[in-house]
C-alpha cells in the first residue's frame, strides 16, 4: 500500500461532503500552508480542486484573513493562464478554496524529470506566465510567490499560474507593511528581502529567475 493510499484512508476529509456540495475523493498535494484534494462538485457535476488550510494555521486571524483574500484576489483575474477560483468557505474550522482542477503537471516536476529545457520550451512557459501576470497586474493583483511549483502545465493549452494565496492587491492595504516577508527565497527580488514590500516588478523578477532555471537547470544562487 502506498503512502498516498494510507493517507487517504486516515484523512477525515476523504469522503466528506463539504458545504453540502463538494464530495472529497482523494488528496492531490500538500504544500506549506494547505492540502489540496480532488473533490466532486455535486451541484454542477464536475471535478474540482479543494484547497484546505492546515489546522495549525487556523487559529491565526492574520493568516485566515490572508487566505480568504486569496479568493477575492484571484476571482478578479479572468484569464486562461490563471487557475480559476470558484468558491470559498470553512470546513472543520479550516478555511478552504474551491478551484479549477488542472489535468497535468507543474514546472518543478518537469524540471526534475528532464533537467534544463530547450530555448523554445523555456520561452513558451515564460511567455504564458507573463501573459497571466499581465492580466493580474491590470486588476491590481500581484502574486509574490512565482516559482516552478506554482506554474501548472495542463495536458493541452497554456501554462497556468496557481496559488495566489500570497497575493496582495496593490489597490488594497497590504499586510506586507508589517514586515512579514512572504515568498520563496531563491525567487524573490532583493527589495522584498530587505523591505517585505512587493509590486508588479517583483513578479517579473521571479519569472526571470524561473527562465534562468529552465535554461540551465539551476537557480542563479541557492537559498541564503
Task: Annotate each predicted stretch with a short phrase.
Residues 125-126:
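Activation segment signature within eukaryotic-like protein kinase domains
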Amino acid at each position: 500500500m502506498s503512502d498516498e493510499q494510507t493517507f487517504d484512508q486516515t484523512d477525515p476529509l476523504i469522503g466528506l461532503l463539504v458545504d453540502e456540495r463538494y464530495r472529497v475523493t482523494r488528496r492531490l498535494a500538500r504544500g506549506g500552508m494547505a492540502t489540496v484534494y480532488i473533490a466532486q462538485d455535486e451541484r454542477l457535476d464536475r471535478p474540482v480542486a479543494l484547497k484546505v488550510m492546515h489546522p495549525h494555521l487556523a487559529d491565526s486571524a492574520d493568516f485566515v484573513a490572508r487566505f480568504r483574500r486569496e479568493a477575492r484576489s484571484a476571482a478578479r483575474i479572468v484569464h486562461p493562464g490563471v487557475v480559476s477560483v470558484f468558491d470559498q468557505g470553512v470546513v472543520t474550522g479550516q478555511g478552504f478554496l474551491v478551484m479549477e482542477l488542472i489535468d497535468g503537471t507543474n514546472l518543478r516536476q518537469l524540471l526534475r524529470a528532464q533537467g534544463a529545457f530547450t530555448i523554445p520550451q523555456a520561452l513558451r512557459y515564460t511567455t504564458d506566465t507573463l501573459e497571466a501576470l499581465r492580466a493580474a497586474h491590470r486588476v491590481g493583483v500581484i502574486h509574490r510567490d512565482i516559482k516552478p511549483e506554482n506554474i501548472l502545465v495542463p495536458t493541452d493549452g497554456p501554462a497556468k499560474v496557481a496559488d495566489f494565496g500570497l497575493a496582495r492587491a496593490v489597490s488594497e492595504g497590504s499586510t506586507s507593511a508589517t514586515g512579514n516577508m512572504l515568498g520563496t527565497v531563491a525567487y524573490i527580488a532583493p527589495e522584498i528581502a530587505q523591505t517585505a514590500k512587493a509590486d508588479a516588478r517583483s513578479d517579473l523578477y521571479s519569472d526571470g529567475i524561473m527562465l534562468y532555471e529552465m535554461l540551465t537547470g539551476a537557480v542563479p544562487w541557492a537559498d541564503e
